[in-house]
Amino acid sequence: MKNKVGAKKGTLKRLFKMLFEFYPVLLPMVLVCVVLNAMISSVPAVFQQNIIAVVEQSWQTKDWGSASGPILKYVSLLIVFYVLSLAAGYAFSYGMAIITQGSLKKLRVKMFNGMQDLPIKYFDTHNHGDIMSYYTNDIDTLRQLISQSIPQLIISCVSVLTVFCIMMYYSIWLLLVVLAGVVLMGVVTKKVGSSSAKYFLHQQMAVGKSEGFVEEIMNGQKVVKVFCHERETEADFDKINDELFHVSEQANRYANMLMPILMNMGNVLYVIVALAGGILLLAGTPNFSISGMALSISITVPFLNMTRQFCGNIGQVSNQINSVVMGLAGAERIFGLIDEQAEKDEGYVTLVNVKEENGELVECKERTDMWAWKHPHSADGSITYTRLQGDVRMTEVDFGYNPEKIVLHDITLYAEPGQKVAFVGATGAGKTTITNLINRFYDIADGKIRYDGININKIKKADLRRSLGIILQDTVLFSGTVMENIRYGNLDATDEECIGAARLAGAHDFITRLPEGYNTMITANGSNLSQGQRQLISIARAAVADPPVMIMDEATSSIDTRTEAIVQRGMDALMHGRTVFVIAHRLSTVRNSDVIMVLEQGRIIERGSHDDLIAQKGKYYQLYTGAFELE
């Protein structure tokens, strides 16, 4: 429990530090307005006492004429303080709106930018709906925390202190009675609050789980309907929803029961203070106070009102603490996302444009058709340039997604510039894993991977991936025009270059037949296009990047036979002069590969050309002749 309390304090401290960094001038000004507003709103009780004292004195002396002046003065001061309170409240509300929305904007940017630097492993191991929950549910709870809970908590705390000082000024005897009741209220608050706090974090996590499930089902709605699993899906959602209901009910039950309990305790305390005041007045007990004034009706009546105000503020503090705890649960999750370790990149070799002068490669700023690896040497400060060719070699590579479970064993292969290498094997054999190692989505456990003779660990990941083109089986398109989606492969590409890439991929003809041609909007991952059309656009996107190395996850496996013939002609031109790795899902597309690697349980068991492997009559032969099915 102490660790959890410490974590909450650390989160709150970090939140204030972040807000101060965002608004170093405005935040202190707003806090001053909050404090002034709270103090000013508590002062009218003093004027109330003065007015009652004047009336009491006039009643005793029967001199009402002399009472009008002091009463008018105190009423005027009361109006002035109310106006000041209104002005401070307006300034606080206006400034807090700027701080809240501005901070959330900057925080969302910080979250999103940080997310772009996370390794692929993070997205493979976290539910996408849960990640979305950071930007929706957690951000909303943080908004309530910054804009409402914390300011109200400060106002209530300052009001408590202000009223406490005023009560001490009037009567310490009555104040002791109030404090005895407040101690009991504090015990109840701690008991109930600690019970609800643990459920608020569970509630945030349950919301993320629920949103993750909904997002998953939305993406797979067609599969659900094809297999008629609507009722089973509803049952699964009911279980998740029941869990969310349970933790939310527990958290809010404790939180909502606190305020009524404190209000009733406050009412009881009000009666007790009234009785105590009456007894002290009747008994003629000497008053003990900072002011030194005798106990009278003019003191007792305002004191009773302050008692109600004091208990109300105590209740507000307790209520806001629960809101703060819930908000901190969201803040804790958000800071957890921000604190996720970014993808490590210790590379220092970069990819640059070069031109050839006097037989040597010279770096240049303008765009050329020639690229080279810029390799600085720390020993003597020299720089060497290695022309980008697309020579990829793996030597005795071992890898496991979990270090304790190796899934690739002793992988050794080489792909010379311009070669086409195909990976064949059942699901789980390691085909996709090998390509994930080439682009360094994951780092190897043992062995070496060299790109143009350079250890890929020395190459900056962004530059390494810029030299690779990837075409996935499951096409991903973004909201925007067809032209924008093609240009995503190279943001500096001109319209003519994008159209040329579309022609190369065989996509130009169908694009020109779209309602707006290249300006046709793509929505919902290209749901307004056929699977084949989406695949053609993704191929054009890779073509405009013009990389020396291509990785293809059997890009044509989702395209019909007629479209495949169109695509294959473009792909043959695209692959010419490039190193190509193909993850094969059907053997008819790999016959013309220079080398075919047959994988089984993370090992290369056969390698060679199509004719060589057929002649060996091994596993590839069995797959090709249908003795085994390729998955």
Question: Residue spans of the language-model regions?
Answer:
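Membrane-integrated ABC transporters
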Residues: 1-41, 55-77, 92-96, 100, ...
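Juxtamembrane helix-loop junctions of ABC transporter transmembrane domains
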Residues: 2-4, 8, 40-56, 60, ...
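An intracellular "coupling" helix at the cytosolic face of ABC transporter transmembrane type-1 domains
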Residues: 21-24, 120-121, 139-146, 150, ...
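Transmembrane helices of ABC transporter permease
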Residues: 26-39, 148-202, 275-295
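Alpha-helical transmembrane segments of multi-pass membrane proteins
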Residues: 33, 43, 81-100, 151-158, ...
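Helix-loop-helix
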Residues: 58-59, 166-180, 254-332, 337-341, ...
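ABC-type nucleotide-binding domain
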Residues: 64, 354-631
